[in-house]
């Protein structure tokens, strides 16, 4: 089944890029392909001008850990682990020692405003706080590209805006690109660019703020791109 067609997109350091469009337009599929969670049947994804295909499973997994950070709608926190321990899981996968992981987890939770909730379990955190733990975990590998799928969907208006403010701050201060799939029109004020998809095609790309010319990720996808059997 063809999901995306004639998609050609660059992603730049320090920018907030929104992917918008109706349900079924290919937003989440594009996000997953950019983040190497799905492999395109046609076309290529390049990181710093180098194709990311032809990697074995272990190399691909390490590339995702080192270059990409993901914040999914389901935060997938371990309920029996504290906020700090949930972040330490990602750091352990990256090879950090227990001592380094503990210190780094504290630093990352401070970055997202949870420095006082290190020992809190997910059940004792609000939805917005759980999301911030997920963001801290996504930052474990100091990613060049942070990706989020509908990050405001489960939050009230106030916390949704706080989440977007945090994403924009991370983009600017950590010089990472932030790519967000969203249906929420309130998020558009935080964007540098907005890519509008319909029926698997980019129908409009709006630039709202200047951004650097050095691109972090390039994904020309043509001929038609399929979802890999999904």
Residue ranges, per PLM feature:
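ABC family nucleotide-binding domain
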Residues: 1-190, 197
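Conserved beta-strand-loop-alpha-helix hinge in the C-terminal portion
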Residues: 193, 201-226, 230
């Amino acid at each position: 089944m063809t999901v995306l067609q004639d998609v050609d997109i660059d992603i730049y350091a320090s920018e907030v890029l929104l992917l918008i469009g109706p349900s079924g337009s290919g937003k989440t599929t594009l996000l997953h392909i950019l983040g190497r969670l799905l492999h395109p049947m046609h076309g290529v994804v390049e990181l710093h001008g180098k194709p990311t295909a032809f990697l074995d499973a272990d190399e691909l997994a390490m590339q995702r850990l080192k270059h990409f950070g993901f914040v999914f709608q389901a935060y997938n926190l371990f309920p029996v682990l504290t906020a700090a321990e949930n972040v330490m899981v990602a750091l352990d996968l990256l090879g950090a020692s227990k001592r380094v992981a503990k210190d780094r987890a504290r630093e990352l939770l401070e970055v997202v405003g949870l420095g006082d909730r290190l020992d809190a379990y997910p059940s004792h955190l609000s939805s917005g706080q759980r999301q911030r733990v997920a963001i801290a975990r996504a930052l474990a590998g100091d990613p060049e590209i942070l990706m989020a799928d509908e990050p405001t969907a489960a939050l009230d208006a106030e916390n949704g805006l706080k989440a977007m403010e945090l994403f924009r701050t991370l983009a600017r201060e950590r010089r990472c690109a932030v790519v967000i799939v969203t249906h929420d029109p309130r998020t558009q004020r935080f964007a540098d660019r907005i890519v509008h998809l319909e029926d698997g095609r980019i129908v409009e790309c709006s630039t709202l703020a200047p951004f650097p010319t050095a691109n972090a990720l390039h994904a020309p996808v043509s001929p038609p791109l399929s979802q890999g059997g999904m």
